[in-house]
Every structure is written in structure tokens, then in C-alpha cells.
Amino acid sequence: MMARNVLVSGGAGYIGSHTVLQLLLGGYSVVVVDNLDNSSAVSLQRVKKLAAEHGERLSFHQVDLRDRSALEKIFSETKFDAVIHFAGLKAVGESVEKPLLYYNNNLVGTITLLEVMAQHGCKNLVFSSSATVYGSPKEVPCTEEFPISALNPYGRTKLFIEEICRDVYGSDPEWKIILLRYFNPVGAHPSGDIGEDPRGIPNNLMPFVQQVAVGRRPHLTVFGNDYNTKDGTGVRDYIHVIDLADGHIAALRKLEDCKIGCEVYNLGTGNGTSVLEMVDAFEKASGKKIPLVIAGRRPGDAEVVYASTERAESELNWKAKYGIEEMCRDLWNWASNNPYGYDSSSEDNSH
């Protein structure tokens, strides 16, 4: 059975909006639920445009997942075949300062969603977990069997939600759940119309680089250049957001398989790239020089993290197609057209 009606929580966000577009283009009908805490409704207006005639199969509700009655209303109006759950707060530093905010938002939101899904007989879920659950891995590449641990409250919310999902499946084998552990999503849709638009100071390398390139910040701070890596800077597995979005569609297809329980897949490229290599690729793509300031290591930052991709390749039939050149090219296309993100636009932000 082809999952036709999909609810996407957090669908106005960075990864969510790109996934919603790929879903629409793939023939799905999509209902987005997002409280717009860290996103803009403009992203969905642009998704609708990019989807052309497929755009009419998109609807949006500005709702917080903790608002049970609003969520129940949405589930009673549409019979969903599956849910893709992106919604959650994701700033590591803020999670350390405000742990209860993170636990309340991410855990209570997810538990409410799972309860309402069960109540309405929708037991197919794709959850956006994160490579952060590997903590500081003792070796690489990270396989799905590695022990999981987390270094901050944000990471713990991802880890706890994974455990909750395993317990829900353990209690009721009608559930089919896929946990996707993303590595480091970067880039943007090749149109340059949607992309990453973090509020406040970005936590991740590439949104920071993009803000330096468009003149919003004076320099990039590199945390640690004394790691035991090729150039002393931290190594991560960067993945193009379009590849990541396509991974979610592969996961939805997998949910149609009757033999599935609660499964975990890494979504990465399997290649490690250092901070300096990434900055260099971005400078080439943009023609801009990124001034660097070297600082000490950030506590809790791992040295080298990249994915083992074998399981996703063999079981989801999915493989990342794009390299860092395309990631940087598409990122710059988005950033140069939208230097202030969605606030650069004159589109009405009120609906």
C-alpha cells in the first residue's frame, strides 16, 4: 500500500520543508503541523510554488504538538497513512541553559503525538533522530549498533525519543517505526528558494559560514585546530539536504514492508570532511573569502564522526548522491538570493 496522506510535524523547518517538497513531487498529500517557533511560513509558500500543480496537495496548521485537542482535530479530519516527525528544538547551547524547555517541548510534544496517532489507528512513524546519539564515538564509521549516549540535553531528547519508540513498538507490534539518524545536513534546494534560516546565532558550521559570506558576521570562529585529524580541525559527515529528504521517502516506502518493527538507519555520505575543507569548498563555490578566528575546543565536541551507510543502502535502497561541491554551490545560491533568510522576502508572513 502506497502511503498517500502524510502528516509532517516541523514541516516548515529546514529539513522538513525540503522533505515536504520531495513528498509533493513524489505524489503524496501532505499536512504540515508546525508551531513556527524556529521557522517561517514563507518556506511553505515557496514549497507550494516549487511544487507547481502538486502544491495543492499541501495544507498547513500552525499548531504546537503539545496542544492535544488541536492535534486530535487534525487527525479526525484526515486519515493519515504515516507521520514524519521533525518538530523539536535543536540548539545545543540553549538546551544546556534551558533543559526543561527542551524536555517539555521535545518529549511532551512527541508523547502527545504518539498518543494521538495510536488513538486514530495511525501507527507508521518516521522519526528524525540524530548522529548526536553516538556521543563521542570511540571509532568510525558509526554503525547503527554502536552504543548510544548523549552529551547535552538536546542530544538526550533524541536518545530518549528513540527509546520511547522502541518501547511503544515493544508494547504493540502493530507499530512500524523508522528512526533516521542524520549526520550534518547542509545545502539547499537548487532553486535557491528554500534553505536553512536559523534564528539567532547559528549552532552549525555552514549557516555560520553563509552569514559571514553575506556580511552578517565578521568572521568564522573555528573551535579547535589541535585535533588528531588531517588539518587539526573536527571532521564530520556533511549530507546534502535533498539527499536527506529523499532518504525520508525511502523510509516511507520501507514502512509498507510488512516485516518491519522499530528500525534504525544512519543517513550520511560515509565521508568525513574537516571544518577547513568545508570552508575551502565554500570559498571556491562562492568566490568569497571567509575570515577565520581559531579558538579552543568546545567541550563535548567529538573529534571525528562519520556514518556507516551500508544498512541504509541495502535496506532502504538509498544512497547520498551529492558531494560537498554541490552542497556549497546550492548553499551559496540560497544565501546570496536570501541574505536575511525568509526575512529578506516581502512575502506576507502572517499566514
Curated annotation (Swiss-Prot):
pH dependence: Optimum pH is 7.0-9.0.
Swiss-Prot/TrEMBL cofactor(s): NAD(+)
Entries under CDD domains matching the protein: UDP_G4E_1_SDR_e
Pathway the protein takes part in: Carbohydrate metabolism; galactose metabolism
EC number(s) per entry: 5.1.3.2
Null mutant phenotype: No visible phenotype under normal growth conditions.
Gene Ontology molecular-function annotations: UDP-glucose 4-epimerase activity
One biological process term in Gene Ontology: galactose metabolic process
Tissue-by-tissue expression: Widely expressed.
Binding residues annotated for substrate, in chain numbering: 130-132, 182-184, 203-205, 221-223, 236, 298-301
Sequence positions that bind NAD(+): G13, Y14, I15, D34, N35, L36, D37, N38, D64, L65, F86, K90, K158, Y182
Active-site annotation: Y154
Catalysis: reaction(s): UDP-alpha-D-glucose = UDP-alpha-D-galactose
Keyword field: Carbohydrate metabolism, Galactose metabolism, Isomerase, NAD
Domain of life: Eukaryota
Activity regulation statement: Enhanced activity by NaCl. Inhibited by UDP.
Thermoactivity: Optimum temperature is 35 degrees Celsius.
Function statement: Catalyzes the interconversion between UDP-glucose and UDP-galactose.
Similarity remark: Belongs to the NAD(P)-dependent epimerase/dehydratase family.
Name of the featured protein: UDP-glucose 4-epimerase 5
Naturally occurring in which organism (per UniProt): Arabidopsis thaliana (Mouse-ear cress)
